[in-house]
């Protein structure tokens, strides 16, 4: 699932430049989706007085995308092995345990479980 439109301070704004092609019709540039807004929010929760450069934000965004793709691919593989057509929280949890090392996996699983519980209780 891709993140929604960026809106917070400190995030890179998407290009809204309107170009005029040969046929005379206006075309808008596609918006580049990123996790920069959410990375910035987490940074401000952890270190309110610390900033982040655009290069560092780009690296963090690449990192989040990479981890997301690895977990999604592993969860997809697990669902296929078990002849399931739906990826559930169980597949995601198992994928996280397989991909992330030791203590990091334990923390990720507990935070994920907490997030799923919060989401289901709010419905």
From Swiss-Prot:
Residues carrying a glycan: 110
Glycoprotein as UniProt keyword: yes
Gene3D superfamilies: Histone, subunit A
Covalent link (Glycyl lysine isopeptide (Lys-Gly) (interchain with G-Cter in ubiquitin)) residue numbers: 118
SMART domains (UniProt xref): H2B (SM00427)
Family annotation (Pfam families): Histone
MF terms (GO), sorted A to Z: DNA binding; protein heterodimerization activity; protein-containing complex binding; structural constituent of chromatin
Subcellular localization: Nucleus; Chromosome
SUPFAM superfamilies: Histone-fold
A Gene Ontology cellular-component term: nucleosome
PTM comment: Monoubiquitination of Lys-118 gives a specific tag for epigenetic transcriptional activation and is also prerequisite for histone H3 'Lys-4' and 'Lys-79' methylation.
Keywords: Chromosome, DNA-binding, Glycoprotein, Isopeptide bond, Nucleosome core, Nucleus, Ubl conjugation
Region (Disordered): 1-32
InterPro entries named in the record: Histone-fold, Histone_H2A/H2B/H3, Histone_H2B, HISTONE_H2B_site
CDD domains: HFD_H2B
PANTHER family: HISTONE H2B
Function: Core component of nucleosome. Nucleosomes wrap and compact DNA into chromatin, limiting DNA accessibility to the cellular machineries which require DNA as a template. Histones thereby play a central role in transcription regulation, DNA repair, DNA replication and chromosomal stability. DNA accessibility is regulated via a complex set of post-translational modifications of histones, also called histone code, and nucleosome remodeling.
Family, per entry: Belongs to the histone H2B family.
Subunit-level organization: The nucleosome is a histone octamer containing two molecules each of H2A, H2B, H3 and H4 assembled in one H3-H4 heterotetramer and two H2A-H2B heterodimers. The octamer wraps approximately 147 bp of DNA.
Name of the molecule in the record: Histone H2B 2
């Amino acid at each position: 699932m891709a993140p929604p439109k960026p809106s917070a301070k400190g995030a890179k704004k998407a290009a809204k430049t309107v170009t005029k092609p040969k046929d005379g019709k206006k075309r808008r540039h596609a918006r580049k989706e990123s996790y920069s807004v959410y990375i910035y929010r987490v940074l401000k929760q952890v270190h309110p007085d610390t900033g982040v450069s655009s290069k560092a934000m780009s690296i963090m965004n690449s990192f989040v995308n990479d981890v997301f793709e690895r977990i999604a691919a592993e969860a997809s593989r697990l669902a296929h092995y078990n002849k399931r057509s739906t990826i559930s929280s169980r597949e995601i949890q198992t994928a996280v345990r397989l991909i992330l090392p030791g203590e990091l996996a334990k923390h990720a699983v507990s935070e994920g479980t907490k997030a799923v519980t919060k989401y289901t209780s709010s419905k």
